[in-house]
Amino acid sequence: LECYQMSKVVTCKPEETFCYSDVFMPFRNHIVYTSGCSSYCRDGTGEKCCTTDRCNGARGG
């Protein structure tokens, strides 16, 4: 699983999925962009999962 994310290619293990999410940090008053490979991932608020090769999780801005 290859995911182009933040100008770099992230390779995950075959049994893993690539997850990226937007986490709001109240004490810093801005959104932190987190991403990584995980064997478990949920599609929830601000969180997406990359399940196909070479999918782009990076959003503009």
Swiss-Prot record:
SUPFAM superfamilies: Snake toxin-like. Its main location: secreted. Expressed by the venom gland. Keywords: Disulfide bond, Secreted, Toxin. It is found in: Secreted. Disulfide bonds join 3-19, 12-37, 41-49, 50-55. Pfam families: Toxin_cobra-type. InterPro entries: Snake_3FTx, Snake_toxin-like_sf, Toxin_cobra-type. One of its GO terms (molecular function) is toxin activity. GO terms for cellular component: extracellular region. Belongs to the three-finger toxin family. Short-chain subfamily. Orphan group XX sub-subfamily. This is Weak toxin CM-2a. The lineage of its organism: Eukaryota, Metazoa, Chordata, Craniata, Vertebrata.
